[in-house]
């Protein structure tokens, strides 16, 4: 529902980052802030607490991050606090990462296997996906024992499911239909 809004915030910050030649720095800093918020119960409690006013929340964030992140990022965080959107910072980060990939002709491919891919398999997969999508492929690999065997690939909205677990489910469905 708020994806459009998340994208607008992300695009605004991305444009500022581009103007200042600090895209990588901004992405890195935002990831760090997201991790700090996610891993700190105290910060989450402060942000969610209805009796702590917006001004106080902004003061706390300024104290926490003024020497750790660029001033433009701090201003961005303060705007999110003002608009009561700071708890959704991770969504803005994800959108900013998507924008980065788009602008650099890259695409993320999520891969699930039971065991890690060999170097040759990884290179072949990157090459084939690169040819198919005509973009540089960024692999995000995950080990998932539940797939039993094979490989699961997700690129954007496209899914290539060559897992043994899916094939077994399909066979089971076919057998049940025949009965």
UniProtKB/Swiss-Prot annotation:
GO cellular component: plasma membrane; proton-transporting ATP synthase complex
Name of a matching Pfam family: OSCP
Keyword Ion transport attached: yes
Compartmental location: Cell membrane
Gene Ontology terms for molecular function: proton-transporting ATP synthase activity, rotational mechanism
Source superkingdom: Bacteria
Family (UniProt): Belongs to the ATPase delta chain family.
Listed name of the protein: ATP synthase subunit delta
């Amino acid at each position: 529902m708020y994806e459009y809004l998340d994208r607008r915030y992300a695009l605004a910050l991305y444009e500022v980052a581009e103007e200042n030649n600090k895209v990588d720095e901004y992405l890195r800093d935002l990831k760090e802030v997201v991790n700090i918020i996610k891993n700190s119960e105290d910060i989450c409690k402060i942000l969610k607490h209805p009796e702590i006013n917006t001004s106080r929340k902004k003061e706390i964030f300024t104290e926490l991050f003024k020497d750790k992140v660029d001033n433009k990022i701090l201003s961005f965080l303060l705007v999110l606090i003002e608009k009561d959107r700071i708890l959704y910072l991770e969504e803005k980060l994800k959108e900013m990462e998507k924008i980065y990939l788009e602008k650099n002709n890259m695409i993320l491919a999520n891969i699930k296997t039971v065991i890690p891919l060999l170097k040759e398999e990884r290179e072949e997969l990157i090459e084939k996906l690169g040819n198919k999508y005509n973009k540089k492929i960024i692999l995000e690999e995950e080990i998932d024992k539940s797939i039993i065997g094979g490989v699961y690939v997700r690129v954007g909205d496209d899914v290539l499911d060559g897992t043994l677990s899916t094939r077994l489910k399909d066979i089971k469905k076919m057998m049940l239909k025949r009965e």
